Amino acid sequence: MTTGVRGDNAPDPSLLAQLTQNANSASAASTGKNGQVAGAKQENVDASFEDLLQDAQGTGGSKKATANQTSKSGKSEKAQASSGTSTTTSVAQASQTATAQAVHGARDSGFNSDGSATLPSPTGTEVNGVVLRKGMGTLALMGLIMTLLAQASAKSWSSSFQQQNQAIQNQVAMAPEIGNAIRTQANHQAQATELQAQQSLISGITNIVGFAVSVGGGILSASKSLGGLKSAAFTNETASATTSATSSLAKTATSALDDVAGTATAVGAKATSGAASAASSAATKLTQNMAESASKTLSQTASKSAGGLFGQALNTPSWSEKVSRGMNVVKTQGTRAAKFAGRALSSAMNISQMVHGLTAGIDGIVGGVIGAQVAQEQRMAGMAEARAEELKSLNSVQAQYASQAQQLQEQSQQSFNSALQTLQSISDSALQTTASMFN
């Protein structure tokens, strides 16, 4: 390259200074992410440099006087350009740091439609199982943050609720077992009562059967006793008839004796009527007086003894045998009467025992029926008690679930408030960061 005045290829110092300044400004503008724009600017700088060279060829000798000064100033400008280039390199390296990238990223993100700053997209795509999509807005990120906080709170609650749920499940599982135990106890009590009722019923039936047997035996004994009474009555009637016949015979004998005595007296009177001696008369009178005395005595005796069995027996022939037979009859009848009295007493005792057996039988049968009813009531009472215990257990479980739900609600409210506070803090921090970047 020549100047046109001197004909040499030495450059113009002023032009070199101008080009150096343009290069410095171009290198300063080329920092950051827009490398293509910086390259385009560099090309523009080169094009302007060539234009300046072409313009410099036409200037000629107007610049000849200042050539030495320009040469000196060009050397100083070269030194400054080298120092500017090193400064530009250090600035470019500083632009690659994380802080610079964050600042440029925030500047490049722009704003939302409502004027708030748009948060940068996260580098990861999943956090604790929650998928993060690119291009999510601020509200979506806040919702995800709240979800993550809720999940963290749920994990912290699960450890405390697991023990409570285990206890509740054990209580729910034990409720039917308690009910079954109460039902079993009630069934055993009812079975014991039923056995007692069956025993009482069997005892009652046995007593009734014994009463029937005793009644049958009593009827047979009474029949035999009535037969004995009829025999005794027949014997008594026979004795009365015999006494009447004996009395009639005694009267007949007395009448016969009187007739004989009268006939003898008449015969004696007729026989001695013709005797003349005083001895015969005296004997006849004596005989008559004796006959009259005997007749009176017999008549009086017969009339006095006609009303009793003993007098009649004495006035009858073989009265001692008759008296002996009468005593035997009395003895026999007395023995029979004693036996009958013993039988009557025994029958009375048997009747008392039979009545007692009948009462015990009725009591046993009624007790058996009532015992069966009591057993049924005991079984029903056991069922009701078992159901009541199960309902108590279920009520306790429901109360525990209600308490657990209340605790969960309170803790959820606390977690929600904590999440809101966290989001508020994040929002305030984002606003402060945005304000600091743009101010």
From Swiss-Prot:
Residues 79-102 have a biased composition (Low complexity). Residues 1-127 are annotated as: Disordered. InterPro entries: BipB-like_C. It comes from the Bacteria. Residues 110-126 have a biased composition (Polar residues). Belongs to the chlamydial CPn_0808/CT_579/TC_0868 family. This is Protein CT_579. It comes from Chlamydia trachomatis serovar D (strain ATCC VR-885 / DSM 19411 / UW-3/Cx).
